[in-house]
Amino acid sequence: MIALVVGGAKSGKSMFAQNLSKSLNESLKNPISGQLDGEIEREVGKLYYVATMNPYDLEDLKRIENHLREREGYGFNTIEETLNMSKVSSLIKEEDTVLIDSITSLVTNYMFRGKEFYKDVSDDILSGILEIINNSKNVVIVSDYLFSDSIQYDCYTENFRKEIGVVNRKLAKIADTVVECSYGNIIYHKGKVI
């Protein structure tokens, strides 16, 4: 299962994605019936949280602290990786459930590496995420929705928005489910209600 969860800041998207990831992973614990010796348990994968934010200021650190508190008790194994999704892919197995939070942070990290500005980053990001998708049972991906205003931004910001848009569109195309979180409301754009 591939799910893309989008929304604005403080929309509830991360909490929704955490609950969805946990639910998908727990659904793998259902026993397989009809075996000779009764019921047997399926092999259950691990639940991973891929934290992609590279904190730049106090607000980022507070957001990270909040996310850590929110996911206490969920059973996530946290992987902190700000760029290399191929490295993440090498750590997971085909029965695992992976939550990637977030595309927005990945685009930021790729575009502003060191003192350079990298304009075209979507292919590199998608390549790493596709590796994770191909190596795991379930992937839930969080991304921001940054396209509802009508303000013209500088060329760097416009390019940033374009790259997020490219990644979001391509992920939405391959996702089984696409969900938008808005003011705590859940809107399904693709797939079934989970």
Each language-model region and where it sits:
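Short secondary-structure boundary segments
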Residues: M53, S102, S143-Y145
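Generic beta-sheet signal
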Residues: M1-V5, L47, D96-L106, V139-I141
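Residue-level signal for inorganic ion chemistry
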Residues: A17, H67, L99, D144, ...
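Portal/gating segments that form or line small-molecule/metal binding sites
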Residues: R69-I92, T97-R113, K119-D123, I133
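Short, functional N-terminal and low-complexity linear motifs
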Residues: G12-A17, P55-Y56, T97-I100, I132-V139
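Conserved P-loop
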Residues: I2-L91
